[in-house]
Amino acid sequence: MSITTLNIMVAFTMALLGMFTYRSHLMSSLLCLEGMMLSLFMLATIVSLNMNFTISFMFPVILLVFAACEAAVGLALLVMVSNTYGMDYIHNLNLLQC
């Protein structure tokens, strides 16, 4: 395992720990999710370059598309919750249930 791969795995682990630690605000959770997706994208790119298969070059692009969709939906949810309730606490999200 190279030092680059180890650093990317540490970045993913730190983002995952941040997701568990800073789960009170929606914005903090979204930033941690983006950090996790970025580290997964970098790891998938390095792995696909090392595999030398042409079909594996599509996986990082597909992962990046899903990350962009996740960010758009998360920001739309953040705007909706902050406009409706005036704050972005996650414990207030259960108020959205019927």
From Swiss-Prot:
GO cellular component terms, A-Z: mitochondrial inner membrane; respiratory chain complex I
This protein's record includes keyword Acyltransferase: no
Top-level taxonomic group: Eukaryota
Chain segments annotated as transmembrane: 1-21, 29-49, 61-81
MF-aspect GO terms: NADH dehydrogenase (ubiquinone) activity
Subcellular location, record wording: Mitochondrion inner membrane
Catalyzed reactions: a ubiquinone + NADH + 5 H(+)(in) = a ubiquinol + NAD(+) + 4 H(+)(out)
Group of enzyme by EC: translocase
Membrane topology reported for the UniProt record: Multi-pass membrane protein
EC number: 7.1.1.2
Keywords: Electron transport, Membrane, Mitochondrion, Mitochondrion inner membrane, NAD, Respiratory chain, Translocase, Transmembrane, Transmembrane helix, Transport, Ubiquinone
Function of the protein: Core subunit of the mitochondrial membrane respiratory chain NADH dehydrogenase (Complex I) which catalyzes electron transfer from NADH through the respiratory chain, using ubiquinone as an electron acceptor. Part of the enzyme membrane arm which is embedded in the lipid bilayer and involved in proton translocation.
Similarity annotation: Belongs to the complex I subunit 4L family.
Quaternary context: Core subunit of respiratory chain NADH dehydrogenase (Complex I) which is composed of 45 different subunits.
Protein name according to UniProt: NADH-ubiquinone oxidoreductase chain 4L
Organism for this UniProt entry: Ochotona collaris (Collared pika)
Name of the coding gene: MT-ND4L
